[in-house]
């Protein structure tokens, strides 16, 4: 049974068709990549999966349940978490405080005026684990806004992981990074995928990252699916070469 099934979704903004009749199926534990030129509809597609936009037509199933009209928070509770093109963190708070907020949200504690000592200890232990997994333990007392772009992105990814998702959506996780930061984030994604058996769908422009990580790749162009296949199949696809990979080269 597929974890995520996107059935023929479209999104129109007036006369503009941003996403046109796109389908996608993601299996448990699979790592998918979505690529395409700027303006291909990738982020709009993500926004529909995560609930920030409603499709004009089509439907979205998560674990066979129709979530097409669910709000983003409801989808988080179902097991869908995401990061954004522009890193979404609390820059004035420390790494640890950011991770604690996400952990408390996942546990339902943010809606309570107080929590027990035992619960507080569990949250603290979970935050420490997240910090260690993200390679952030030596920076966890620093404000996130003072960190490098790569460490800010790692913080955001670990905040998403704190929500205990079964599906993690990563929107251009290495955008704006140099080679070392790109390598670090790529290794982090690979390790999280392996250790937590997560299903991951990522949007990415760096083809080194895509071909290193993805089990399968979907190519969007002008809002429609141009091709789908394994990394070798996509690399050899002449239509993809003409529309995207050839330009990137």
Segments (PLM) and residue ranges:
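Glycine-rich phosphate-binding loops of nucleotide-dependent enzymes
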Residues: 1-249
């Amino acid at each position: 049974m597929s974890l995520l099934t996107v059935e023929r979704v479209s999104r129109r903004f007036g006369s503009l068709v941003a996403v046109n009749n796109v389908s996608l199926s993601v299996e448990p534990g699979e790592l998918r990549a979505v690529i395409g030129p700027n303006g291909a509809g990738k982020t709009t597609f993500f926004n529909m999966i995560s609930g920030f936009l409603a499709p004009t037509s089509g439907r979205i199933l998560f674990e066979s349940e129709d979530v097409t009209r669910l709000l983003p928070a409801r989808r988080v509770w179902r097991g869908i978490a995401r990061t954004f093109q522009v890193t979404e963190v609390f820059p004035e708070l420390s790494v640890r405080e950011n991770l604690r907020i996400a952990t408390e949200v996942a546990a339902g504690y943010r809606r309570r005026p107080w929590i027990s000592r035992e619960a507080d200890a569990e949250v603290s232990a979970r935050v420490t684990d997240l910090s260690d997994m993200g390679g952030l333990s030596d920076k966890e007392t620093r404000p996130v806004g003072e960190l490098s772009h790569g460490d800010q992105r790692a913080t955001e990814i670990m905040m998403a992981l704190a929500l205990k998702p079964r599906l993690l959506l990563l929107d251009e996780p290495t955008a704006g990074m140099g080679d070392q930061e790109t390598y670090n984030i790529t290794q982090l994604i690979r390790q999280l995928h392996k250790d937590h058996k997560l299903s991951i769908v990522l949007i990415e422009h760096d083809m080194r990252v895509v071909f290193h990580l993805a089990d399968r790749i979907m190519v969007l162009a002008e809002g429609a699916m141009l091709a789908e296949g394994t990394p070798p199949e996509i690399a050899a696809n002449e239509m993809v070469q003409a529309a995207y990979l050839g330009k990137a080269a």
